Amino acid sequence: MVHLSGSEKTAVTNLWGHVNVNELGGEALGRLLVVYPWTQRFFESFGDLSSADAVMGNAKVKAHGAKVLTSFGDALKNLDNLKGTFAKLSELHCDKLHVDPENFNRLGNVLVVVLARHFSKEFTPEAQAAWQKLVSGVSHALAHKYH
């Protein structure tokens, strides 16, 4: 559960209304794979990840990034039940994929960077604080199966 105040919900939802999940999702996942290259081992089937340009231009990275970012939209609709919303994804990432749960935090932080880059004027310190709360809540929900 993420407790966002009314103004925090407004900040998050207003910005979310301008997010292009295809563009920003691909960028966020791509940046994760470039900045934290050891995370690439989970995406070996995606083809060429040999350089930053290859990662950022990879169609499979972009498509999966859009899918990942779409799940943040689900989070916004289910702030009171993030653990339930992400239960199946948590189980998949824990039991089948064996993803280090710290990678969820990393992705959340990369997403905040991407949002700041694209929405610099709207991404006020207050908006950043609200988004940090949201990505932390999503990260915690995704890591739930690990506990």
Curated annotation (Swiss-Prot):
N-acetylvaline modifications at: 2
- Modification Phosphoserine occurs at: 45
Superkingdom, taxonomy of origin:
Eukaryota
This protein's GO cellular component annotations are: blood microparticle; haptoglobin-hemoglobin complex; hemoglobin complex
Q: Where does heme b bind?
A: 64, 93
Q: Where on the chain is S-nitrosocysteine found, per UniProt?
A: 94
Remaining remarks? In a single animal, two types of beta chains were obtained from hemoglobin I having the alpha-1 B chain variant.
Please report the name of this protein according to its UniProt entry.
Hemoglobin subunit beta
Tell me what organism the protein belongs to: Tachyglossus aculeatus aculeatus
